[in-house]
Every structure is written in structure tokens, then in C-alpha cells.
């Protein structure tokens, strides 16, 4: 059908073929046409329905353009392609711009050569006019209305970004988001009225992000803020570098900068009315919610530090960590419930450190405590300057000060004891009021309750020490099990593995060396220095022993002997219940078991003396090998190297000088004073010689002569078997 004139249809028109109109077409009824070409106006009084797949094609100079609306896209020229323009005056100035979408009254109205813009909503991107690919997107009434030369902005929501001019790279989603800014770039506002008042009048890279109802809605010139959550940061004006994530996070602050608040109401009341770098970090439900002007706090965990208002430089990490404190400064609380009751009502530099579940959870006003480990120091209230490291360490302390507890359950029971150091599992476990103790090693000073001034280093050292009342113990035990059975003994020094490990009520002992004084129970005032020294000494009743043994195995076999002084390797190592002996030198008095009152000074002196029954020997031997062969002789005084070194069962001899009386075995009651005096005398049967020789080599050749008196150097030095001679003077009777 070809029609050149006007056609008015009052009823239905149905045509199976094509209809070409050169004039106008007015239709009041229904028109069903396969194809309609109209050169004039087409007016429909009723609805127009297009079949699926049908197109509206409007003529323009460019290609693939869609124009619907009064003067929509009516300036498109050759080169303006693939534009979709719907609405009166939508894209009406576009000439050569491509791939633009404008939907709405006067949307994208002034753009001519710009491309790839999307404007949906009345007056959206109305004033944009920039050549090139700008990639602006505006969706909503008046969104991006004032943008002239800005690029790559995404604005969604009524009045979103509606006064931006040449700003770039902004994202605004929500009613009136970014609705006051003119030249700020690189902001992201998502949510009703987010970043609503931000306004930069000069080109500025802002980098603000506001996501949530009213997020950052009072910011004017603040930059680089990230605010996510309804009302987050909604009081900020020109604050910078803040992060707020969560409902009401950082909702009161106006000029505080460099804060981080993540969580519901985190840092909710923080408010700096002058420009301040707060450096606060709060992460968790109501974390740091009461902070007003406190600075440099790090808060991570639900309810952490949520009562503090002006506290500074606190670190609280964990649920309810530091939850009650209001004005305390410089605390570190890491772990759920750490320092949960601490509360300083006036500004105080506290310096408490608590790390671990519920560590320090009873502290109220204690300061300078360091507590590390689950439940460490969890009963401490007002104690100061304590250190506790380990699960349940220092777990009962109420008021003790200046304690250090490191290790699981170390100082577990301490209540008021002060100045203690416990290092190791269960060290000082039972201590309550004891003070000035040092325990290093598992179970060291484990049972001590009231004792003070003890030092135990080594596993189980002083394990059972437990005086019945508060007593200054002054015990020192160093080594595995050293003094482990001491209960009420005091002033003992026990150093070495198992040193004094059986002592219980003994006092004032010194044991230094592995197994030194290891068997004694109640002996007092012994000194044992060296491996296994006095190792078998054992007094079952309280006894002042006054034994001193110094050297490897010195006095090793002594059981109940007292007042012995044994110095040197193996010195007196066979003595058992012998008393009042002195042995100084390796192996000196080394074989005797029950001889008493002997003095042996020098290597191998009296080395073979041996009394098997208790005997007062009164032997004195001083010098290398002096009296070396004496076995059961008594009352001998032998002084000098090898003096009387062949005597065996001889008695009452005096030999003073090197090699004096050096050959005799059974002669008794001789006196030889001087080098080599009576050096050859030798009685092979028990004989009272009554010889006296004084002087170098005096009587040097006498062998079996008796009752001679020879005084002077070389006096009678040639006599052999002569008797009853007296020679006085140098070389007399020579």
C-alpha cells in the first residue's frame, strides 16, 4: 500500500503487506502492520505494541544510533555512531561522539564530540562537554549534572555528584552522594548522603572512600579517608588518613587524623576539636568506643579498651582486653580477657604487659607488671613490677611486688610474696608470702610457702623447702636435685647435681660438687667441696659436724665422724666415724677408717694409716709422703718431705726435716730434728730407741743403736749400732 496523503483511521487497520506513507499518519484504533515507512509525523492516540524483534530506526547522519525524544540526538553528524539517546533534548548536541547513552530529559545535553558516556536520569551529565573517550557514568536525577570536563566518573543516585565540574575518577552511589564537591577527584561514596559535604574548590586527588548510610557526610576537605559502614566517620570535616569500617565507627570525631576503626561503634566517641594525628587503631565490636582524646592506642577485639577515654599508647588485642580502664597509659594487653579489670581513674603511666588468655585479669591498680601466658598473673590485683611468663604462672598473686615468674605455673600460689624470681615449670609453685627467693628450673623451691631469701637453680632444687612460718632461709642450691629434701634447714649452700639432696633439717652446710654431702639428713656446719665429698655422711639427729672436705672423693666414706678437715683428692676418703682429723693433700690419710685426731698435710702423708676401731692417734705428718707407711702407729710427729716415711706400727716418734727418720719401720720414741737426722735408723721389731738427733745429718748412720743423744750438724754421723752416746756440737763424735 502506497499512500501519498493523510490517513485518519477511526477503526482497526490490518494490512498483510508493506505500508508506505508520504504524509502524516493518525491512528485512533489498533494498527497491525509488518513494516511502516513514514516520512511525516506519526500520532498514536492508543498504545503502540511492537512485536518481539521489531526495531525503531530513526534516521541520522551517523550509523546505528537510536534517538527517541524531542530533538534527542538531532545534531548527530557523520562519524557520530552507536549512540542511544532517549528523552527530550537527550544528547541533543552530540555531533561526532560515539557509543554514548543518554536516557532522560536533557541527559547529556551539551556533549558534542565526547564518547562512551552513560547518562540515565533527567539532567544527568547535562553539562558535560569534553572530546575523547571520557567513560563517565551518571544514573539518577541530576547526577553529575555540573560535570564539564571530568572523566571516568561513576555517579549513581539522585543528585549524586551533581556539582562536580572537572573532577575525575570518582564513584558515587546513593542519594546526594558527593553532592557538594566541585573539583575533588578519586573519591568513592556509596550510600545515602555518603561524602555529601565534601568540597574541593581546586583540583585535588582526594582518595576518600565513604561506603554506608551517611558515611563521611560532613567531610569538607579531609583526604585519604576510608569510611565504610552506616554513619562511619560522619562527623569528620577536614580530617585525613582515617579508616572507619562498621556502623558508627569513628562517628564523633571532627579533626582527628590517622585513626583506624574497624567494627561496630569502634572509636565511636573519639573527638579531636583541633587537628590531631591520633594514630589510634581499633578493630572489633565497640573496640575503643569510649576513647575521646586518647592517642596512639592499638585496640583489636570485641569490647577491647572500650571504657578508656583519655588513655594513651595502649595496646589491647583480644576480646575484652583492657575493657575497664579509663585513663591508664602505656599498657599492652594481648589475649581475651587480659587486664580486664584494670582501671586507673587518673592519668597514669602504667606500663603493664599481659599476653595470653585472661592474663592479669584481676589487676586493678598494679603497675609495671609483665605477664605472658594463659592465666598468668590472673589473680594479681595491686602488685607492681612483677614478671610472669608461662601458663598459670603467678596465678594467685594479690599484692606481691617485683616478682618474676617464667614457666608454666611458676609462682602459681603467690599471694603477697615480693621480690621473688621463679624460672621454670612449677618453680616456686607453692610460694605465698615468701620473699626474695630465686628459683630456676622445673619444680625448684616447689613446696616453699613462707621461706624467704633462698636461691635454687636446677630441676627440683630445694623442692621440699617449707618452713612452718615466715623465715629467712638463706639457702642456696644449684644443680639437679640439689637440696631437694631440705624442709626447714637454713643457710645451706649446695652446688652440684644431687648436692646435699637428702638434707632436710640441717643448717649452715656447704656442698659443692656432684653428690657432695648427698646422704646426710640433719648434720650441720659441714663443708664438702668436690665430687662425692662427704657423700656418705649421715646424721639422723641434729648434729654440729664441723666437717670440711675439699677435693675429689675427700671424706667420701665418712658417716658420723665430726670435726674433720680433709682437703685434697681422696683425702681421708676411707674415714667413717672418725673425728678431729686434718688431711691436706692428695690421698693424705686415704686408708684410715676410724682413727681420730690425726693431722696429715702433704701429698700421700699418712696415706696407709688405718685404724679399724675408734682410736685417738695423735699422729701429725707434714710434708710430701711424711709418715706414708704408718699403719697403726700413734703419737708420731713427722714434719718434712719423707719424714718417717717408712714407719709402720711405731709410736711416739718425732721427725722434723727432710728424710728425717726415713728408714725406720718399728722403732719408737725417737727424736730426729734436721735433714737426714737418724735417716738410716731401722728397727724391724718394736723397739723403744730413745735416740735423739738434732742437726743436719745428726746420727745419719745409726741403724739399731739406742739411747744416743746427738746434737749438732753431723754429730755422731758415723755411728751405726752404738748405744748411750752423747755428742753435742758440729761434727762431734764424727
Residue map of PLM features:
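Fibrous stalk/shaft segments of extracellular and virion attachment machinery
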Residues: 1-50
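Glycine- and small/polar-enriched repetitive beta-structure motifs of secreted/surface proteins
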Residues: 47-734
Amino acid at each position: 500500500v502506497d499512500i501519498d496523503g493523510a490517513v485518519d483511521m477511526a477503526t482497526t487497520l490490518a494490512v498483510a503487506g508493506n505500508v508506505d506513507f508520504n504524509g502524516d499518519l493518525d491512528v485512533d484504533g489498533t494498527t497491525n502492520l509488518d513494516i511502516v515507512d513514514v516520512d511525516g509525523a506519526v500520532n498514536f492516540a492508543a498504545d503502540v505494541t511492537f512485536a518481539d524483534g521489531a526495531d525503531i530506526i530513526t534516521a541520522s547522519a551517523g550509523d546505528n544510533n537510536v534517538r527517541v525524544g524531542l530533538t534527542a540526538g538531532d545534531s548527530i553528524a557523520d562519524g557520530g555512531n552507536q549512540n542511544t539517546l532517549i528523552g527530550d533534548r537527550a544528547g541533543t548536541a552530540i555531533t561526532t561522539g560515539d557509543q554514548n547513552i543518554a536516557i532522560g530529559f536533557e541527559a547529556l545535553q551539551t556533549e558534542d564530540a565526547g564518547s562512551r558516556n552513560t547518562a540515565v536520569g533527567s539532567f544527568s551529565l547535562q553539562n558535560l562537554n569534553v572530546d575523547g573517550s571520557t567513560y563517565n557514568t551518571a544514573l539518577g536525577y541530576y547526577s553529575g549534572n555540573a560535570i564539564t570536563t571530568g572523566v571516568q566518573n561513576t555517579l549513581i543516585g539522585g543528585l549524586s555528584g551533581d556539582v562536580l565540574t572537572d573532577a575525575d575518577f570518582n564513584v558515587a552511589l546513593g542519594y546526594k552522594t558527593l553532592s557538594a564537591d566541585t573539583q575533588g577527584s578519586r573519591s568513592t561514596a556509596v550510600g545515602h548522603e555518603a561524602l555529601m559535604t565534601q568540597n574541593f574548590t581546586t583540583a585535588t586527588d582526594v582518595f576518600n572512600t565513604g561506603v554506608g548510610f551517611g558515611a563521611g557526610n560532613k567531610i569538607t576537605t579531609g583526604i585519604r579517608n576510608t569510611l565504610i559502614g552506616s554513619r562511619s566517620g560522619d562527623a569528620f570535616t577536614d580530617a585525613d588518613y582515617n579508616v572507619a569500617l562498621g556502623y558508627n565507627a569513628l562517628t564523633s570525631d571532627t579533626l582527628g587524623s590517622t585513626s583506624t576503626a574497624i567494627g561496630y561503634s569502634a572509636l565511636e566517641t573519639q573527638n579531636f576539636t583541633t587537628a590531631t594525628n591520633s594514630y589510634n587503631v581499633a578493630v572489633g565490636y565497640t573496640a575503643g568506643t569510649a576513647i575521646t582524646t586518647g592517642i596512639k592506642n592499638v585496640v583489636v577485639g570485641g569490647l577491647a579498651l572500650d571504657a578508656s577515654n583519655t588513655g594513651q599508647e595502649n595496646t589491647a588485642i583480644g576480646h575484652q582486653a583492657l575493657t575497664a580502664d579509663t585513663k591508664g597509659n602505656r599498657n599492652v594487653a594481648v589475649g581475651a580477657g587480659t587486664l580486664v579489670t584494670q582501671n586507673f581513674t587518673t592519668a597514669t603511666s602504667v606500663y603493664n604487659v599481659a599476653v595470653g588468655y585472661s592474663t592479669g585479669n584481676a589487676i586493678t591498680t598494679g603497675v609495671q607488671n609483665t605477664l605472658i601466658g594463659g592465666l598468668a598473673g590472673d589473680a594479681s590485683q595491686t602488685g607492681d613490677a612483677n614478671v610472669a611468663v608461662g601458663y598459670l604462672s603467678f596465678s594467685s598473686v594479690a599484692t606481691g611486688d617485683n616478682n618474676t615468674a617464667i614457666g608454666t605455673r611458676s609462682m602459681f600460689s603467690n599471694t603477697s610474696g615480693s621480690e621473688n624470681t621463679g624460672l621454670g615449670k612449677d618453680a616456686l609453685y607453692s610460694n605465698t608470702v615468701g620473699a626474695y627467693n630465686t628459683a630456676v628450673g622445673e619444680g625448684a623451691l616447689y613446696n616453699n610457702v613462707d621461706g624467704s631469701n633462698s636461691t635454687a637453680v636446677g630441676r627440683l632444687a630445694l623442692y621440699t623447702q617449707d618452713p612452718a612460718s615466715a623465715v629467712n632461709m638463706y639457702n642456696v642450691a644449684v644443680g639437679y636435685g640439689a637440696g631437694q629434701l631440705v624442709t626447714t634447714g637454713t643457710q645451706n649452700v649446695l652446688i652440684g647435681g644431687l648436692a646435699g639432696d637428702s638434707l632436710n633439717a640441717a643448717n649452715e652446710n656447704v656442698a659443692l660438687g656432684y653428690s657432695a654431702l648427698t646422704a646426710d639428713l640433719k648434720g650441720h656446719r659441714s663443708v664438702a667441696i668436690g665430687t662425692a665429698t662427704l657423700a656418705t655422711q649421715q646424721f639422723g639427729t641434729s648434729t654440729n659436724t664441723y666437717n670440711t672436705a675439699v677435693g675429689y672423693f675427700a671424706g667420701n666414706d665418712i658417716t658420723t665422724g665430726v670435726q674433720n678437715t680433709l682437703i685434697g683428692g681422696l683425702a681421708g676418703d676411707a674415714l667413717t666415724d672418725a673425728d678431729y682429723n686434718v688431711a691436706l693433700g692428695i690421698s693424705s690419710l686415704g686408708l684410715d677408717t676410724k682413727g681420730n685426731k690425726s693431722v696429715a698435710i702433704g701429698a700421700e702423708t699418712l696415706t696407709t694409716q688405718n685404724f679399724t676401731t675408734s682410736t685417738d692417734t695423735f699422729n701429725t705428718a707434714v710434708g710430701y709422703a711424711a709418715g706414708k707407711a704408718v699403719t697403726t702407729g700413734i703419737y708420731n710427729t713427722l714434719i718434712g718431705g719423707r719424714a718417717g716415711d717408712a714407719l709402720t706400727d711405731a709410736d711416739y716418734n718425732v721427725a722434723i726435716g727432710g728424710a728425717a727418720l726415713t728408714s725406720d719401720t718399728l722403732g719408737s720414741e725417737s727424736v730426729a730434728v734436721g735433714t737426714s737426722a737418724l735417716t738410716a735408723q731401722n728397727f724391724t721389731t718394736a723397739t723403744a730407741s730413745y735416740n735423739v738427733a738434732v742437726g743436719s745429718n745428726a746420727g745419719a748412720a745409726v741403724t739399731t743403736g739406742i739411747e744416743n743423744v746427738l746434737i749438732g750438724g753431723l754429730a755422731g754421723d758415723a755411728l751405726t749400732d752404738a748405744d748411750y752416746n752423747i755428742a753435742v756440737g758440729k761434727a762431734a763424735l764424727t
